[in-house]
Curated annotation (Swiss-Prot):
Its cofactor is Mg(2+). It holds the Pfam family Methyltransf_3. Highly expressed in bulbs. Detected in leaves and inflorescences. This is Norbelladine 4'-O-methyltransferase. Optimum temperature is 45 degrees Celsius. Optimum pH is 8.8. It comes from Narcissus aff. pseudonarcissus MK-2014 (Daffodil). It catalyses: norbelladine + S-adenosyl-L-methionine = 4'-O-methylnorbelladine + S-adenosyl-L-homocysteine + H(+). The gene is N4OMT. The keyword Transferase applies. 4'-O-methyltransferase converting norbelladine to 4'-O-methylnorbelladine. 4'-O-methylnorbelladine is a precursor to all Amaryllidaceae alkaloids such as galanthamine, lycorine and haemanthamine, and including haemanthamine- and crinamine-type alkaloids, promising anticancer agents. Can use norbelladine, N-methylnorbelladine and dopamine as substrate, but not caffeic acid, vanillin, 3,4-dihydroxybenzaldehyde and tyramine. The keyword Electron transport does not apply. Pathway: Alkaloid biosynthesis.
Length: 239
């Protein structure tokens, strides 16, 4: 039986349905560790019309920890929005780290740019205003062995995640990580049907159900689907 839209709150882009527990996590663990410029960017983004696309602060800390544990230096980000996850990545990378960041809307990136500049990490970022697929295809054509990436983070058009995966599994080195955001889609992926969603949300929900099944069966990666934010799937490239 399908779930009603009333069963889950879509107010917060978070798989954790206890608002009290979420508030506790953010106020106890996340916000005290949040970089000053990340806090400023978050507060500005929360006032934006598409604020639901903001990566939560606890997820940001998770991404930062993973990047540091991996000693990542070269990363790809597909879907930037105002740049919260991008700034998180730039702060986590070493001084000579490099990020290729791709988004169709530079105006959103420019909202976050002053915070990136104040944090002193703009030099790590190569922002490309474009659809991602042609950029990834060009990168594959020009790629040399030493150009492989350590890490990729995808938070963009949901119906294209599988297409991005086919390219990223070649662009990211063996042992590197590819992360997909929103893969639990408010918890709605657990149900064959989920009445009440807007048509574009339903398209995304079905795309994620298909993606989750596909990634679980992909022998090129090992995966872990983490219940943080709106669900993050980590893929480690095996070959």
């Amino acid at each position: 039986m399908g779930a009603s839209i009333d069963d889950y709150s879509l107010v917060h882009k978070n798989i954790l349905h206890s608002e009290d527990l979420l508030k506790y996590i953010l106020e106890t663990s996340a916000y005290p560790r949040e970089h000053e410029q990340l806090k400023g960017l978050r507060e500005v983004t929360e006032k934006h019309e598409w604020s639901s696309a903001l990566v939560p602060a606890d997820e940001g800390l998770f991404l930062s920890m993973l990047l540091k544990l991996m000693n990542a230096k070269r990363t790809i980000e597909i879907g930037v929005y105002t740049g919260y996850s991008l700034l998180t990545t730039a702060l986590a990378l070493p001084e000579d780290g490099k990020i290729t960041a791709i988004d169709v809307n530079k105006s959103y990136y420019e909202i976050g740019l002053p915070f990136i500049q104040k944090a002193g990490v703009e030099h790590k970022i190569n922002f490309i205003e474009s659809e991602a697929l042609p950029v990834l295809d060009q990168m594959l054509e020009e790629m040399k062995e030493e150009d492989l990436y350590d890490y990729a983070f995808v938070d963009a058009d949901k119906s294209n995640y599988a297409n991005y995966h086919e390219r990223l599994v070649k662009l990211v080195r063996i042992g590197g990580a590819i992360l997909y955001d929103n893969t639990l889609w408010y918890g709605s992926v657990a149900y064959p049907e989920y009445p009440g969603l807007h048509p574009e949300e339903e398209v995304a929900r079905l795309s994620f159900r298909n993606l989750n099944t596909f990634l679980a069966a992909d022998p090129r990666v090992e995966i872990s689907q983490v219940s943080i934010g709106d669900g993050v799937t980590i893929c480690r490239r095996l070959y």
